[in-house]
Amino acid sequence: MRIALYPGTFDPITLGHQEIIERGSFLCDRLYIGVAVGHHKKTLFSLSERCELVNGVLADLTLHCPVEVVPYCGLLATLYQKLHANILIRGLRSAGDFEYERQLFYANQHLNAQIETVFLLPAPQYSFISSTLVRELAQLNGALDGLVHDIVKKKLRLNSGGQ
């Protein structure tokens, strides 16, 4: 059985993330979306809010295998092993992402040589979208169309005082 793990902070989940999830679901028999606590980042949404948003978005996606959201804290390599995953899915938008992901790849290999990483490039219309950009636009009351799902947009607007 091919079990994949697509980890991230998803603060918030974007249309780019959604596309990677849909395409990733073709590659496996079961897909886990690992939502990280995000100790290294100050998150806008709590872990439970981020899991709720991911689950809400999943309901509207065309998925080709069962998908489950799993919150996690700690090492990605530990979660990978716990879930019996054999594919780690990561998205690459730019050369900067590649360099960061290359370092993570080697760190994960150091922790667990069994980790196989598959990198997916987003469609061009999603290649510039980041959760950071979305949070900044929301904070400044910028347009979020074409960046996030409507439920995410609504949550961002509520979080920024309904502006």
UniProtKB/Swiss-Prot annotation:
**Pathway membership:** Cofactor biosynthesis; coenzyme A biosynthesis; CoA from (R)-pantothenate: step 4/5
Record-listed ATP binding positions? T9, F10, H17, G91, L92, R93, E101, Y126, S127, F128, I129, S130, S131, T132
Is Nucleotide-binding a UniProt keyword of this protein?
A: yes
Give the record's subunit note: Homohexamer.
Biological process (GO) annotations held by this record are: coenzyme A biosynthetic process
Its required cofactor(s), as named, are: Mg(2+)
Q: What does this protein do?
A: Reversibly transfers an adenylyl group from ATP to 4'-phosphopantetheine, yielding dephospho-CoA (dPCoA) and pyrophosphate.
Residues annotated to bind substrate? T9, K41, L76, R90
Transition state stabilizer (site feature) positions: H17
Name of the protein: Phosphopantetheine adenylyltransferase
State a single Gene Ontology molecular function. Answer: pantetheine-phosphate adenylyltransferase activity
| Recorded family membership | Belongs to the bacterial CoaD family.
Which Gene Ontology CC terms are recorded?
cytoplasm
Q: Which UniProt keywords apply?
A: ATP-binding, Coenzyme A biosynthesis, Cytoplasm, Magnesium, Nucleotide-binding, Nucleotidyltransferase, Transferase
Q: Tell me its EC number(s), please.
A: 2.7.7.3
